[in-house]
């Protein structure tokens, strides 16, 4: 990430809080439109902070992979069980596996349909949101800043005489593990190229090339993270250490705007989608409304979409 990015100027503790909130919000009923909007915002932040589109395209490629995988899993159609109602027969492979297959007539065929696609799309959007939030946190914060943020986050544990510094070092190393592995892969590939080993897109089919790349990467990553952990423990980020070379960032207007805009966006999407869930036509409700089933003031006319919003919004079962 570019050092001049505005995300580098935001307090690391605030970014850690925002990452945790994103993890929770990803599994709340944001709705399909809400997840699309959040992903667009996160991908835009990735492009702005990186000043290139490559990182956003990598995240999108992973989202497409999970979309393809979930479409395959959710596309199986079940033989109808005449002993059950029509609604109970509208289930997918996940429900079939969880129930042990006892409540359904069995798997009949695979079909690409709107309901399976929407269910898979929601899961892929949630995964993409988590990837984007983690990418923004790890690339905009140094390992020192992450360790300091984690220690401040778990500061209350000191009341129970629990040492927070080892926990903060461990979590900081875990947060920076993927960027470390990425940099080590690039370094090892360049070193191996001088010895005549050229890696291309088909190299993963060659077991010998895989071993010559990933074994050195694994050993180098373990050694580097161990060295980093020792360095943090010896000097690093301890606020009481007079020999420290780093200082925590101070809160400023940018921090406040970043937190306020993020919380406001999450709140608006949650309220809008839950408003839609409450005001849909349900025979069990004693209230009647003139405008039911609207998302952002637009009515749902498709029965498949309506069923999806009402019953399978969480899309984790």
UniProtKB/Swiss-Prot annotation:
Record carries keyword Transmembrane: yes
Family (UniProt): Belongs to the CbiQ family.
Domain of life of the organism encoding this protein: Bacteria
Organism placement in taxonomy: Bacteria, Bacillati, Mycoplasmatota, Mycoplasmoidales, Mycoplasmoidaceae
Major location category of this protein: membrane
Name this polypeptide is given: Uncharacterized protein MG302
Pfam families reported in the protein's UniProt record: CbiQ
The keyword Transcription regulation is annotated on this UniProt entry: no
Membrane topology: Multi-pass membrane protein
CC per GO annotation: plasma membrane
Subcellular location, record wording: Cell membrane
Keywords, comma-separated and alphabetical: Cell membrane, Membrane, Transmembrane, Transmembrane helix
Residues annotated as transmembrane: 18-38, 58-78, 92-112, 130-150, 159-179, 202-222, 252-272
Record InterPro entries: ABC/ECF_trnsptr_transmembrane
């Amino acid at each position: 990430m570019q050092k001049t990015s505005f995300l580098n100027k935001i307090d690391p503790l605030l970014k850690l809080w925002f990452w945790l909130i994103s993890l929770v919000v990803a599994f709340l009923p944001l709705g399909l439109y809400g997840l699309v909007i959040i992903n667009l915002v996160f991908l835009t932040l990735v492009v702005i902070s990186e000043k290139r589109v490559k990182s956003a395209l990598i995240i999108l490629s992973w989202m497409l992979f999970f979309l393809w995988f979930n479409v395959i899993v959710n596309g199986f159609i079940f033989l109808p069980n005449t002993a059950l109602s029509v609604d109970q027969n509208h289930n997918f492979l996940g429900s079939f596996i969880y129930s042990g297959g006892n409540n359904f007539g069995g798997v009949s065929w695979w079909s690409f349909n709107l309901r399976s696609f929407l269910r898979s799309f929601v899961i892929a959007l949630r995964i993409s949101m988590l990837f984007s939030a983690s990418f923004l946190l790890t690339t905009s914060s140094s390992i020192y800043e992450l360790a300091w943020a984690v220690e401040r986050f778990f500061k209350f544990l000191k009341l129970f005489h629990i040492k927070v510094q080892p926990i903060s070092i461990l979590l900081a190393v875990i947060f920076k593990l993927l960027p470390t592995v990425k940099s080590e892969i690039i370094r090892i590939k360049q070193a191996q190229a001088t010895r005549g080993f050229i890696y291309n897109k088909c190299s993963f089919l060659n077991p010998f090339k895989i071993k010559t790349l990933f074994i050195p990467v694994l050993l180098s990553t373990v050694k580097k993270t161990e060295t980093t952990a020792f360095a943090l423990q010896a000097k690093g980020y301890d606020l009481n250490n007079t020999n420290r070379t780093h200082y925590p960032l101070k809160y400023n207007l940018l921090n406040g705007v970043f937190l306020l805009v993020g919380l406001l966006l999450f709140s608006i999407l949650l309220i809008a989608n839950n408003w839609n869930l409450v005001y849909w036509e349900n025979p069990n409700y004693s209230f009647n409304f003139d405008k039911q089933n609207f998302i952002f003031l637009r009515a749902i006319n498709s029965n498949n979409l309506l069923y999806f919003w009402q019953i399978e919004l969480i899309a984790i079962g």
